[in-house]
């Protein structure tokens, strides 16, 4: 799990906590999750439902891409129900372009391909195109999920059960014990072979 850098653009606000209290909790949860994954967590300043899809955010994310030089970028598929996920989908693609073609403030560039993760809130038109075997890391990932309050305590959706069960189902479909699925943009969905 070396080199994992989740970048949370927003923080949510459940009824029993103030926005500021939950922001602190989410930052601590992100750190706990990434400590287990041997990574670093970044959380930007935007509140739940308030992530703007604008040039300022795109440039901020592009700066992060250039600074950390990821091998690949995983982000949200476009969403039919979550405004922030939908904005993130487009922000990251534009930030990838800025980072790879224009570069940061110093003109330094970095390109990394973008993959879209499977998420129940973003499943409209999601095509599980790439199956990745996560069997070796499943126990660690499962343990890391326990650091996320909403995953373990939501009264609205059984996140933990859903994602661990989905990993098993995707594993069965791919001949593995556990797997996670990713999508790519349509123009990346091609195979080039010398013969069939």
Enumerate the predicted regions with their spans:
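Active-site rim/loop-helix segments in enzyme catalytic domains that contact anionic ligands
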Residues: 1-68, 195
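Metal-dependent de-N-acetylase/amidase catalytic core
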Residues: 18, 35, 52-196
